[in-house]
From Swiss-Prot:
Tissue-specificity statement: Expressed by the venom gland.
Protein's UniProt name: Omega-theraphotoxin-Gr1a
Species of provenance: Grammostola rosea (Chilean rose tarantula)
Location of Valine amide modifications: 85
Record-linked InterPro entries: Huwentoxin-1
Domain commentary: The presence of a 'disulfide through disulfide knot' structurally defines this protein as a knottin.
Length: 87
């Protein structure tokens, strides 16, 4: 009888140690995920373009990229294709 109780207590102790180790690994995983998310916030911001792309807001044709022209469309002026082709 004493041997059975000893085996049960020993089994519970082993289970407790295994659960604690698993919990420590999970905590480390949470920390690693948090660090990755923090690093993703440091992504560089897109740089401002030197020309306005298709459907972009413009004030004159020189603002638009090649083959685009600034046209007055409601509710604002936008860059649209000027009909030209080529490089």
């Amino acid at each position: 009888m004493k041997a059975q109780i000893f085996v049960v207590v020993l089994g519970l102790a082993a289970l407790s140690v295994l659960c604690y180790g698993s919990e420590a690994d999970e905590s480390a995983l949470h920390e690693e995920i948090f660090q990755l998310l923090a690093a993703s916030d440091e992504v560089p911001k897109p740089q401002e373009r030197d020309c306005v792309r298709f459907w972009g807001k413009c004030s004159q044709t020189s603002d638009c990229c090649p083959h685009l022209a600034c046209k007055s469309k409601w509710p604002r002026n936008i860059c649209v294709w000027d009909g030209s082709v080529g490089k």
